[in-house]
């Protein structure tokens, strides 16, 4: 196994969600030697349901998606910055659905309708934060990469 593909540095942050006023955990997993390799550009991959991404103890079903082992087992995958955005627990379906469900499976409880707000949170809060913390740039020259 190619040891250079091991991901060792994870940073945890709390970002305020504008439409709820609550803080949300966002984790950034950086490739090994990220801070030493300043000339290299890295793509950024965003995962929703962030509780499920890294740790089985945090996953709602007791098993994580095992992103780190998957990357380690596949050395041909380019090194990348992995961003995991936690969901809102009981409000998960509201955030991931742009429209309200016509009929709720639970009487007197509405589902959906916050998808636009969640997308705005990702685009206007999370992505700029990731850019600031990692040096990632979305300009036409850099595309999905770290600016030089």
Could you tell me what each predicted segment is?
Residues 1-148:
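Non-catalytic cap/lid and distal C-terminal segments of serine-dependent acyl enzymes
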